[in-house]
From Swiss-Prot:
<feature type="binding site">
    <location>
        <position position="96"/>
    </location>
    <ligand>
        <name>Mg(2+) 1</name>
    </ligand>
</feature>
<dbReference type="Pfam" id="PF00591">
    <property type="entry name" value="Glycos_transf_3"/>
</dbReference>
<dbReference type="InterPro" id="IPR036320">
    <property type="entry name" value="Glycosyl_Trfase_fam3_N_dom_sf"/>
</dbReference>
<keyword id="KW-0460">Magnesium</keyword>
<feature type="binding site">
    <location>
        <position position="229"/>
    </location>
    <ligand>
        <name>Mg(2+) 1</name>
    </ligand>
</feature>
<dbReference type="GO" id="GO:0000162">
    <property type="term" value="P:L-tryptophan biosynthetic process"/>
</dbReference>
<dbReference type="InterPro" id="IPR005940">
    <property type="entry name" value="Anthranilate_Pribosyl_Tfrase"/>
</dbReference>
<dbReference type="InterPro" id="IPR035902">
    <property type="entry name" value="Nuc_phospho_transferase"/>
</dbReference>
<comment type="pathway">
    <text>Amino-acid biosynthesis; L-tryptophan biosynthesis; L-tryptophan from chorismate: step 2/5.</text>
</comment>
<dbReference type="InterPro" id="IPR000312">
    <property type="entry name" value="Glycosyl_Trfase_fam3"/>
</dbReference>
<protein>
    <recommendedName>
        <fullName>Anthranilate phosphoribosyltransferase</fullName>
        <ecNumber>2.4.2.18</ecNumber>
    </recommendedName>
</protein>
<feature type="binding site">
    <location>
        <begin position="112"/>
        <end position="120"/>
    </location>
    <ligand>
        <name>5-phospho-alpha-D-ribose 1-diphosphate</name>
    </ligand>
</feature>
<feature type="binding site">
    <location>
        <position position="229"/>
    </location>
    <ligand>
        <name>Mg(2+) 2</name>
    </ligand>
</feature>
<comment type="similarity">
    <text>Belongs to the anthranilate phosphoribosyltransferase family.</text>
</comment>
<keyword id="KW-0328">Glycosyltransferase</keyword>
<keyword id="KW-0057">Aromatic amino acid biosynthesis</keyword>
<comment type="subunit">
    <text>Homodimer.</text>
</comment>
Amino acid sequence: MSSFNIHEILEQLYAAKSLTSEQSQAFFERVVQGQVDPIILSSVLTALKIKGETAQEITGAANALLAQATPFPRPDYDFTDIVGTGGDGLGTINISTASAFVAAACGLKVCKHGSRSVSSKSGSSDLLAAFGLNLDMSAQQARQCLDDLNICFLFAPQYHAGMRFAAPVRAALKTRSIFNVLGPLINPARPQFELMGVYAPELLKPIAEVHKELGMKRVMVVYGSGLDEIALHGETQVAELIDGKIIEYTLTPEDFGVQHYPVEAIIGGDPSENKIIIEQILQGKGSDAQQAAVAVNVSALLVLNGKADNFKEGTKQALAMMLTGKPLQLLKTLAERSQC
């Protein structure tokens, strides 16, 4: 990479020409090493956004961030992640975080990668901190929790320290950039299975292609009528990576055996408000809409990990598991273990 030339990259982008995966990787490696001037970074992020980021550019950036991440002792068993880009602006309850604990209670190994809020009042780490989870637990400690409890949480800033170099530019630009889609792609444990929500339908196919380039086994990329998760208020568009191919289809609440509910029925609040709501959901005491919103996302995770034959069966499994209260117990146990 000694021939790396930042001005060539800039000129290429100014001409609306896409970068190769290698060029993108070389550039973002320098970003997370603190070697890129903020003005240059601002120009590149803006040019990429106006042109529209390609799968190759996103893959290169993801590979750069994964290469620079703090290592995680990766297990040799299969495990999964459920995560959204955020940025849908709707401020719903923490569906993917709640779903992670239900899925773990159903027997999946879930390595949840997350950070602070992007668009909601409460990101995954904000919520888990409200439950008493120590976000700074070591990688070894997190791995032990994955082994023993079926679940762990990896706090993105702890594993991607180099992202701090981009933070001032991202804050100043106040707009979505390639970084918004990178978060769900850079779990340092590198799961082979993932349910990933995106904030715009045009991201579905490119992000599925990125997962393929990153060597994932099976992934569902979803956009639920404005939500970065599977929706109850309308259709959910899906791009699924399966057996090395990407297939596109649409899901409705009927496919999961549940009713339609308005999106207003799953709006959340700040972390302390969301904590109360999630506490209810994880023991089957939430509203019908709240229980269903979590159940359909758990169902998709169960199907893509081979733990349910179809979405209706997966939804039934998830709803039944919440009624046992086991998912809440799991969350409390993880919080206790993280403080040791």
